[in-house]
Amino acid sequence: MRKMLAAVSRVLSGASQKPASRVLVASRNFANDATFEIKKCDLHRLEEGPPVTTVLTREDGLKYYRMMQTVRRMELKADQLYKQKIIRGFCHLCDGQEACCVGLEAGINPTDHLITAYRAHGFTFTRGLSVREILAELTGRKGGCAKGKGGSMHMYAKNFYGGNGIVGAQVPLGAGIALACKYNGKDEVCLTLYGDGAANQGQIFEAYNMAALWKLPCIFICENNRYGMGTSVERAAASTDYYKRGDFIPGLRVDGMDILCVREATRFAAAYCRSGKGPILMELQTYRYHGHSMSGPGVSYRTREEIQEVRSKSDPIMLLKDRMVNSNLASVEELKEIDVEVRKEIEDAAQFATADPEPPLEELGYHIYSSDPPFEVRGANQWIKFKSVS
C-alpha cells in the first residue's frame, strides 16, 4: 500500500511541475487526421484539376502551423529591426503570404528546385535555413546565410537560387534550372516564382515559349497579391487572369490564402511536370499586409479597412488554426504553446543577429571567382586591404 501511494505521489508531483496546458494536451485524445473541402481551382487548358477534398494529418497540421507562425513572427521582427535602423537597404516582407511559401514546400520534394524574386525571406526559411541565418543576413552579419553580403534580396540555400533583385529576371533562370533537370535525366521540377507586378515583363513570355517548346519540368508561379509597388492589378494589366497568360501552357488559379489549396495544387502541378507533359502555370491569389517594401506603408493606394478585412476573413494562419481546433487535430492551448516557442526562437535569433560581428573587409573579395583570382592586374591589386570601406 505504501509503495502504491508513493508511486501515485511521484506521478502527481511530476504533473504539478508541468504547465497546466501541457498536462491537458498530454491527456487529451486528438484525431490523427481529418478531411477538408477546399476551393476548386480555376482551370486553363486542363480537363481535370487538383482535388476539392484533402486529408490533413495532425503531424502535418502542427508542422504547417509552426512554419507559418515562424515566417510571420520573423517578418514582424524584421520590420522592428528595420525601424530601429539595424536592418538597412532594401527589405520586402511577406507577412500575409505564408500559405504560399509553406504550401508550395509541402507539395514538392527537398530535391526539387525553387527560385523567386526579392520577397524571399519565407522561401529561404521553408527551403531549410534557420531564422538565425536569415535575420543575421538582414543585419549584414558574418553568421548570415550569405556571410552578410546578400541582404534581404539575395539569400540562397541548397536547391534555392534566391532572392533576385531585378523584376522578372529570375523567370528565365528558372526555365534554365528546369532545362538542367531534364538534361540530367532527373525526376525533379523547378518552381519559378514572380509577382503580378512582373507578369507583364517580356522575358517571362520568352521563357514560357522555350519551356513549352522543350517540355521543361517548370512550374511558373505568379504570386498575385493584388498590387505591384503601388498599382492595383486592374490598372496594370489588360487581363488579370494570370493563370491564362501562358496561352499554350495549361494553368491553375489557386486560393493562395489556404495552405491546403496551395499544397494540393502544387502536388498536381508537380505530377504534371514529372509526367513529361512540359510546363504548367499557377496563379496564387494572395495578399501582403505590409507595403511593397519598407520604404512605404502601403496605405496610400489601399485603405486600412481593406487590409483589416483580409486579416479578419482570410488570414492563412487563422484559417489553419480554426480547421485544426474544430476537427480535434489540436487544441487552442497546444497552439498557444507553439506561439510562445516561436516567439522565443525569433527573439533568440534577433539577439544573435545584432550581436554577431560584421564580416571583415577581406570578405569582400571572396566567392566571386571559382578559383584564386589574379590579384595583380596591370601592377595593381584591386583587393588591397583597407582599414575602412568609407
From Swiss-Prot:
Mg(2+) binds at D196, N225, Y227. Keywords: Acetylation, Carbohydrate metabolism, Glucose metabolism, Magnesium, Metal-binding, Mitochondrion, Oxidoreductase, Phosphoprotein, Pyruvate, Thiamine pyrophosphate, Transit peptide, Tricarboxylic acid cycle. Its EC number is 1.2.4.1. GO terms for biological process: glucose metabolic process; pyruvate decarboxylation to acetyl-CoA; tricarboxylic acid cycle. Its cofactor is thiamine diphosphate; Mg(2+). CDD domains: TPP_E1_PDC_ADC_BCADC. The modification N6-acetyllysine is found at K63, K244, K313, K321, K336. Phosphorylation at Ser-232, Ser-293 and Ser-300 by PDK family kinases inactivates the enzyme; for this phosphorylation at a single site is sufficient. Phosphorylation at Ser-293 interferes with access to active site, and thereby inactivates the enzyme. Dephosphorylation at all three sites, i.e. at Ser-232, Ser-293 and Ser-300, is required for reactivation. Pyruvate binds at H92, Y118, R119, A157, G165, V167, D196, G197, A198, N225, Y227. The modification N6-succinyllysine is found at K63, K244, K277, K313, K385. The modification Phosphoserine is found at S232, S293, S295, S300. Pyruvate dehydrogenase activity is inhibited by phosphorylation of PDHA1; it is reactivated by dephosphorylation. It catalyses: N(6)-[(R)-lipoyl]-L-lysyl-[protein] + pyruvate + H(+) = N(6)-[(R)-S(8)-acetyldihydrolipoyl]-L-lysyl-[protein] + CO2. PANTHER family: PYRUVATE DEHYDROGENASE E1 COMPONENT SUBUNIT ALPHA, SOMATIC FORM, MITOCHONDRIAL, PYRUVATE DEHYDROGENASE E1 COMPONENT, ALPHA SUBUNIT BACTERIAL AND ORGANELLAR. Heterotetramer of two PDHA1 and two PDHB subunits. The heterotetramer interacts with DLAT, and is part of the multimeric pyruvate dehydrogenase complex that contains multiple copies of pyruvate dehydrogenase (E1), dihydrolipoamide acetyltransferase (DLAT, E2) and lipoamide dehydrogenase (DLD, E3). These subunits are bound to an inner core composed of about 48 DLAT and 12 PDHX molecules. This is Pyruvate dehydrogenase E1 component subunit alpha, somatic form, mitochondrial. The lineage of its organism: Eukaryota, Metazoa, Chordata, Craniata, Vertebrata.
